[in-house]
């Protein structure tokens, strides 16, 4: 299972998620659309983190980090249920 954000400017989807998935048996790729970037998959930051490292902590206004985390969890659970028998 490989997940990535369509707006990832750190590691572009074409040279990372899709590239690596081509070499991973049974890989399933999910690209979150829109403004989902590289750091959205990190845990929520504290106030101090947002003040110190805003690039890691602040997402585009259209991105709901908690929703991305929940969807990624659902995808992982389903993937492992199918492939770890």
Task: Identify the residue ranges that each predicted region occupies.
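Short, amphipathic alpha-helical "lid/cap" segments that border enzyme active or binding sites
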Residues: 69-77
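Short alpha-helix in the alpha/beta-hydrolase fold that links the catalytic acid
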Residues: 12-22
